[in-house]
Amino acid sequence: MTRIMKAYTFRMYPTLSQKELLEKSFGISRYIYNYFLGKNNYKKCINKFQCIKELPELIKENEWMKEVDSCLLRTSIFNLEDSFKRYSKGLSNHPKFKSKQKSKKSYRTNNITSTYKGKIYNSIEINLEKKLIKLPKLKEIKIRGYRNLKQIKGRVVNATIYKEANKYYVSVCVEEELTIPVITPTKAIGLDVGIKEILTTSDGITLENKKHIQKYENKIKGLNKWLARSTPGSKNRYKIIKKLQTVYKKLKNARKFYLHTISNEIIKENDIITCEKLKITEMTHKSPISKQIYDASWYELIKQLEYKSKWKGKIFYQVDTYYPSSQLCHHCGYQEKNLKDLGIRNWKCKNCSNQNERDINASINILWEGIKMYLKNELQAD
């Protein structure tokens, strides 16, 4: 049995009083983050324990903080600490103050278990039959999502409540025990990602890039134009922002659905999956095709393949970033170094005269590398 962390996202339907409390919670979470960032703005890291020690005094000075879940005060500090850690590792810029208008409205609360008169109580409870979730301070809220899910098997760890496109959502993190099947690999596949075709497989199959951004691009441009002309603080501006957020939400959902469809099919049909290890940040830096790369969502696709492989007992490998998969002839291994121009889609091997299609050739080379990795691991295990 293997323990995994799984997230279930539901849409919430709070009452007016619950909405007020949610908005207060978002505001206080942002206030705590900004308060301790202001005190540590010129530092490279923060001491979260020292910040937590200062909380009781801060609550005394601001009585309105008692109205919300006390857990979100600490998690806001933990989020700030994570931001500083990412900054110190060079993964992001220095943490910035959160804006009331621009920053994402969200907070996280942990599930706290307590015992009273022999009964066990959890601060976060989900009833899928009645379609209700119980959250600290908010009591029960109606939820919707996962039509076929009858019961969540596992321990609820925490819940992240957020607002997106004027709708409220809760993402529940659950620790589950998963029985991973032991399989004997019978089929392997190599995958090459691209812009025109999001995936080319070593079997010669190409999966088209839906280019979701093209469907919504004109609408986004039009709404942004109206937004620029609207008066700050006006009702009309608020309506435009709401419409814009809805369009972005649709775009995000369309991308994710398509990627889940692709990854599910690949995992179902294959036992060894190999793809490239990509450095997306480097590829998009000052690149004329950066928008197309972001729209293709390669990182999300690879991430899905990785965790789904683990859950299903499949084997997932990534070849080195600088492995010349497009330059090597899969037939004889000859390397043609003059193939840096992406416009060259077909080339003839000078060594064996084999005609190679760029993407299919690359995916076959990636497949061979994956098989080599598998055999190497098997020999080391013996």
PLM feature segments, named:
Residues 20-23, 27-30, 34, 71-78, ...:
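Non-catalytic, well-ordered alpha-helical scaffold segments
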